[in-house]
Design a protein with these regions (language model features):
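Short, small-residue-biased leader/transition segments that mark boundaries at the very start
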Residues: 1-3
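Generic, well-ordered alpha-helical scaffold segments in large soluble proteins
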Residues: 5-12, 51
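Alpha/beta-hydrolase-fold serine-hydrolase catalytic core, especially in secreted/extracellular enzymes
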Residues: 14-103
Length: 103
């Protein structure tokens, strides 16, 4: 699903109703399904369990990138249309130094 597909679904179903069960988290730099330079590894099941338990989609999902099996970067995955924005201090390889915000 891409952002334009999501917008079409939200418009057809009604934004408030659809947002209870649909969310899009983009993974910048990830290949088609995995790999690439992006932070492509995250616990999808835990994110869904959190959503069900809390009754709302996660505000962010922390994903990791590994090189030779070692985590070398973490980054928040943000619910569309938000994106991860660098706070301006700290390592750009650590998710804690980013915030999800509208572009």
């Amino acid at each position: 699903m891409c952002s334009s597909d999501l917008e079409a679904v939200l418009n057809a179903a009604g934004t408030s109703a659809a947002e209870k069960s649909i969310a899009l988290y983009m993974v910048p730099g990830m290949g088609h399904c995995q790999g690439g330079a992006g932070t492509d590894t995250f616990d999808k099941v835990a994110a869904i369990e959190q959503w069900v338990a809390a009754g709302r989609a996660p505000a962010q999902i922390v994903a990791v990138h590994r090189t030779a099996g070692k985590i070398d970067r973490t980054r928040p995955l943000c619910p569309y249309p938000e994106v991860a924005k660098y706070k301006g201090t700290g390592s750009t390889d650590e998710a804690a130094n980013f915030v999800c915000a509208k572009p």
